[in-house]
Amino acid sequence: NYGVTHTIRHVLVNDNEKDLLLSCYKFDCRSCGNTKLKRVISLGYQPLANNLLNKKDEKCELYPLEVNYCDRCHNCQLSVAVNPKKMFSNYLYTSSTSKSFREHFVNAANKYIKDFKLNKKKSYIIDIGSNDGVALKPFKNLGFKKILGVEPAKNLAKLANKNKIKTFNGFLEKSNLSKIKKDADLILASNVFAHSDKLKEMAECMFKLLSKNGTLIIEVQYLLNTLKDLSFDNIYHE
């Protein structure tokens, strides 16, 4: 009975919606496993982000867009975890189209090179969820040779490789670890954890790819800023 766990007390669903919900609803915290999550906001049923249809009356799958809060570890998370293959097999958003993104990663690359004393010839840099290579391109332009993107979307990995930014096409998961070169001096993960249902596995994989003295940099949304800015439009299935 989906109505029991929904912000709206009773929601009637058909058999297809029922099967969809049962396959992707999350009853435990992705971070700590706590099963007593609190619903803080419901934005109704929504399609996947960037789900562009060819016809106005064309049907698409809708998922409840809700945020759950864990009072044990304070992690905020969506109530459902959509099959990642549906979301990332062919991803429509290319990060390089954003001028602010490009500028951010140029500034970030310069800062990381200085702070961590990275060497153009020796330092090995991995970007997880690398999209079209936007975060690695500044390193490439500065002469870094050992860079690697990890990107699940085939179209984006193909685009990055076409632009001479070496990219592995696949998810960061244990089954793919043997296919990715290890001992990275720097691993970047920008807005990646928000897209994954397997936080612990992904974190474990990152540490296995990292060299003994390497650095892992994670960028995620900050709840306090979301509340201050009322940026509820940053909540979506992606």
Which positions does each model-derived feature cover?
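N-terminal juxtadomain amphipathic helix
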Residues: 14-100
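Short, glycine-/aromatic-enriched active-site segment of Class I SAM-dependent methyltransferases
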Residues: 51, 218-238
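Conserved class I S-adenosyl-L-methionine
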Residues: 121-131
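Conserved SAM-binding loop of SAM-dependent methyltransferases across substrates and taxa
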Residues: 132-144
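Conserved SAM-binding motif I beta-strand of class I
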Residues: 146-151
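Conserved SAM-binding strand-loop segment of SAM-dependent methyltransferases
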Residues: 164-177
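A conserved beta-strand element that flanks and buttresses the S-adenosyl-L-methionine
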Residues: 188
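A short glycine-rich, Lys/Arg-flanked "PGG" loop and its adjoining helix->strand segment in the class I
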Residues: 200-215
